[in-house]
């Protein structure tokens, strides 16, 4: 009996999920299977590929022929290299980053809320008006300091004139 390792399609129209199965070569794509050895989800980022390496090695050793798609998956997981005795048996499988738990996200948001807002919640018009007001106040303060400095310079001259007289 000719045995193939092939993909059995599951899922809705635009969301395919596949099972990696061992089946007779003459059966339909979604027909009766001998054994289910893994899953493949191409729509996830990165793609989810889970294949039982031990069972894949067994079926390859007894002569099961993988389809082109399954052969590509076996190369990614490193099972094909292990079977052929080629270097690079670790494969090139990408692993998704673990999602942070909801409790961690909640605690992080809570700490950010306690620290206060990181950016000012002021519109551009109000911000510009406030900057103009601050600039006017700074100019008035500078003018007042200049006037006070000028008066203090004039005062010693008047005192010196009073002493001479």
UniProtKB/Swiss-Prot annotation:
Q: Where is the composition biased (Basic and acidic residues)?
A: 129-144
* Phylogenetic classification of the source organism: Bacteria, Bacillati, Actinomycetota, Actinomycetes, Mycobacteriales
Q: Does the keyword Ribonucleoprotein apply?
A: yes
Compositional bias (Acidic residues):
151-165
Q: What family is reported?
A: Belongs to the bacterial ribosomal protein bS16 family.
Which InterPro entries does the annotation name? Ribosomal_bS16, Ribosomal_bS16_dom_sf
What species was this sequence derived from? Corynebacterium glutamicum (strain ATCC 13032 / DSM 20300 / JCM 1318 / BCRC 11384 / CCUG 27702 / LMG 3730 / NBRC 12168 / NCIMB 10025 / NRRL B-2784 / 534)
> Which Pfam family would be a valid example here?
Ribosomal_S16
Matching entries from HAMAP family are given as: Ribosomal_bS16 (MF_00385)
Write out the GO biological process terms: translation
Q: Where is this region: Disordered?
A: 110-165
Keyword annotations for this protein, in alphabetical order, are:
Ribonucleoprotein, Ribosomal protein
- Its name, as the record gives it, is Small ribosomal subunit protein bS16
- Name the domain of life: Bacteria
| Primary gene name | rpsP
What's a GO cellular component annotated to this UniProt protein?
small ribosomal subunit
GO MF annotation list: structural constituent of ribosome
